[in-house]
Regions:
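Single conserved hydrophobic/aromatic residue that forms the stacking wall/gate
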Residues: 1-12
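Short glycine-rich loop/turn motifs that provide flexible caps or phosphate-binding loops at active sites
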Residues: 6, 66, 121-122
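Structured C-terminal helix/loop/strand segments within mature extracytoplasmic catalytic/sensor domains
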Residues: 70-175
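Active-site-proximal helix/loop microenvironment
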Residues: 13-79, 83
Length: 175
């Protein structure tokens, strides 16, 4: 499904091995979730799947196609193939709006006006359902592990296009 989402082949980066060897906190969280019946499979298998997904090597173009697929109701804008049901778009978008920037998600939403997801490799992808998907990639990260330049680029695009719902054009009500 991920290949269909981005429209091309992805690779597992070398970071997978080092991340697997050092992800003690995530291992603890996985077993804690298992204890509270929130992980229904083997925690080690679930954690390995999560770590592999976090270690996927993608380009800014791949991120943009993935974001565009979500924005386009599950239809890949390049291949024109339905990747997932359109009814999942609001669920995906609300999820990345609330946790895509982890503890900074609220600040991000207010200052950018677009739900977005960050990656530790310096990528940020944003989704405006029914409008477009956008991404930027720049490895220098801030103290929270988010790309400084990618954030600035996406905020610039949103503000330049007047699409930030929190500071965009105002409607005048006429009696």
């Amino acid at each position: 499904m991920l290949r269909s989402l981005v429209g091309s082949e992805m690779c597992i980066r070398d970071s997978y091995k080092s991340e697997t060897a050092t992800n003690f906190n995530n291992r603890s969280i996985a077993w804690l979730l298992k204890n509270y019946n929130r992980i229904y499979d083997d925690p080690n298998m679930s954690l390995d799947l999560y770590t592999r997904q976090c270690s996927l090597g993608v380009t800014a173009q791949m991120l943009s196609v993935a974001a565009g697929t979500v924005a386009n109701g599950g239809v890949n804008p390049v291949t024109k193939k339905q990747v997932f049901d359109a009814e999942l778009t609001p669920k995906i978008t609300s999820m990345i709006a609330t946790v895509g920037f982890y503890e900074h998600s609220g600040d991000w939403m207010y200052t950018s006006g677009i739900p977005a997801k960050t990656g530790v490799g310096g990528g940020v992808m944003g989704v405006l359902p029914g409008v477009f998907g956008v991404s930027a990639f720049a490895p220098p990260l801030d103290g929270s592990g988010n790309s400084v330049k990618a954030q600035l680029a996406i905020k610039y695009i949103m503000n330049k296009l007047g699409l930030n719902v929190f500071n965009g054009a105002r409607v005048t009500i006429v009696d």
